[in-house]
């Protein structure tokens, strides 16, 4: 196969060495991340914090703690995790829609992308600062955490805030370093490692339950089959595309006449990714988190009712969760894909869709297809996110992953494999072009 592609041993060795270096860079960066997640902030009693967080099942705190690889429950220097960066990225994307100057910067290509990334970093710093101040100052006010700070003086608060902000900025830099020198999206890989950090212990616990008879062996096998089926569905949907055929009219360049060419515009079914699931979880779990985290008096009938009906296994929670996912899918897809802009670019490049007039009609046609795809994609995300809830409540199965986490894990693995394939294929094409004296 190597000979057919025109590759020699020297080039193959070069690709292998580059791949090894990139994978080594990712591994080293992730080892640093995991070590940092075990370094505690000085002055906090981590035993009290860990005990309180163990009671925060089915809240935003549990989800954020999972994303940080347990760093939040250990009050580590990476307790804030990478969430401020994700939030700032979405905020900047929103601002590019409402602020004309930012919209123009976005269209400037590589230079504009660099500026947008810089604004995202500044916003991350501001968000991390506000979040760290909020967390550190509110810790003693939380029910059961009166003694969590050993010496609650100015020096502690100042040091803790600086450490948390620095930890988040370091993770952001580490993620960008992985993206540049490693393989895949660095931020996604950091979240991925945070999620799977507790997977080995969860697997051992499930196997132990099966061995002791607490979990029937047939039910265990059914769960395994269901998990593999869900993973297959996620891979299938994430790789699926709706291709719109684009034609380019006959054109003349010098003495050469180029005939009509055709290509396609690929539209992913789930263009919004996992962001809608994260936002939907945060919004729906917010009331329970506030009541549980700050110990609001549950004797109040209204608060008691809210706390009960917003539990993850309640019908109201599930209905609101599904509708939130659908809403955020449409909302975020509108941010990342603009049919009118796509139609204008096609018109400028001489492309058109058969039977559709260029310009406004093309934009409406693409938008119509996107609405259908987004609806299907949102229902798919909702289905994936509800499966773990069903397994926990109806089947009484201890499932470590939530639907959001499962989506992130599978999508990141797919992206990682795709990046490796791209690296290998690009090297193969380069070798073929050199051998044919085309490069």
From Swiss-Prot:
Transmembrane domains' residue ranges: 23-43, 77-97, 125-145, 154-174, 187-207, 217-237, 274-294, 317-337, 369-389, 397-417
Keywords, alphabetical: Cell membrane, Membrane, Protein transport, Translocation, Transmembrane, Transmembrane helix, Transport
Record bears the keyword Transmembrane: yes
Location(s) in or outside the cell: Cell membrane
Pfam families, alphabetized: SecY (PF00344)
GO CC entries: plasma membrane
Domain of life where this protein originates: Bacteria
The protein's assembly and partners: Component of the Sec protein translocase complex. Heterotrimer consisting of SecY, SecE and SecG subunits. The heterotrimers can form oligomers, although 1 heterotrimer is thought to be able to translocate proteins. Interacts with the ribosome. Interacts with SecDF, and other proteins may be involved. Interacts with SecA.
Name assigned to this protein: Protein translocase subunit SecY
Organism of origin: Buchnera aphidicola subsp. Schizaphis graminum (strain Sg)
Lineage: Bacteria, Pseudomonadati, Pseudomonadota, Gammaproteobacteria, Enterobacterales
């Amino acid at each position: 196969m190597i000979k057919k592609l025109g590759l020699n041993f020297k080039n193959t060795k070069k690709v292998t060495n580059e791949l090894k270096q990139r994978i080594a860079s990712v591994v080293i960066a992730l080892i640093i991340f995991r070590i940092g997640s075990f370094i505690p902030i000085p002055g906090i009693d981590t035993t009290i914090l860990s005990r309180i967080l163990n009671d925060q099942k089915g809240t935003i705190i549990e989800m954020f703690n999972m994303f940080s690889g347990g760093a939040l429950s250990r009050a580590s220097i990476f307790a804030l995790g990478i969430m401020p960066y994700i939030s700032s990225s979405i905020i900047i994307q929103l601002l590019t829609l409402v602020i004309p100057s930012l919209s123009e910067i976005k269209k400037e290509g590589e230079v504009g992308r660099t500026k947008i990334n810089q604004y995202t970093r500044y916003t991350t710093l501001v968000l991390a600062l506000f979040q760290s101040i909020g967390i550190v100052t509110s810790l003693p006010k939380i029910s059961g955490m009166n003694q969590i700070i050993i010496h609650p003086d100015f020096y502690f608060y100042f040091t803790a805030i600086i450490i948390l902000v620095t930890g988040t900025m370091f993770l952001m830099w580490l993620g960008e370093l992985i993206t540049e020198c490693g393989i895949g999206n660095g931020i996604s890989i950091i979240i991925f490692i945070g999620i799977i950090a507790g997977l080995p212990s969860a697997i051992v616990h499930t196997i132990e339950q099966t061995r002791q008879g607490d979990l029937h062996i047939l039910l265990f096998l059914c769960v395994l089959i269901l998990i593999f089926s869900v993973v297959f569905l996620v891979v299938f949907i994430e790789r699926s595309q709706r291709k719109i055929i684009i034609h380019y009219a006959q054109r003349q360049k010098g003495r050469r006449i180029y005939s009509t060419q055709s290509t396609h515009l690929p539209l992913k079914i789930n263009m919004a990714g996992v962001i809608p699931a994260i936002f939907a979880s945060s919004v729906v779990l917010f009331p329970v988190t506030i009541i549980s985290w700050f110990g609001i008096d549950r004797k109040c009938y209204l608060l008691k009712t809210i706390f009960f009906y917003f539990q993850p296994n309640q019908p109201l929670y599930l209905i609101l969760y599904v509708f939130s996912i659908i809403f955020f899918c449409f909302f975020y897809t509108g941010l990342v894909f603009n049919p009118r802009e796509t139609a204008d670019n096609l018109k400028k490049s001489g492309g058109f869709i058969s039977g559709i007039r260029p310009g406004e009609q093309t934009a409406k046609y693409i938008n119509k297809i996107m609405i259908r795809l987004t609806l299907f994609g949102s229902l798919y995300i909702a289905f994936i996110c509800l499966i773990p809830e069903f397994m926990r409540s109806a089947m009484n199965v201890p499932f470590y992953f939530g639907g959001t986490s499962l989506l992130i894990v599978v999508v990141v693995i797919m992206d990682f494999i795709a990046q490796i394939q791209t690296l290998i294929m690009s090297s193969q094409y380069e070798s073929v072009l050199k051998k044919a004296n085309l490069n």
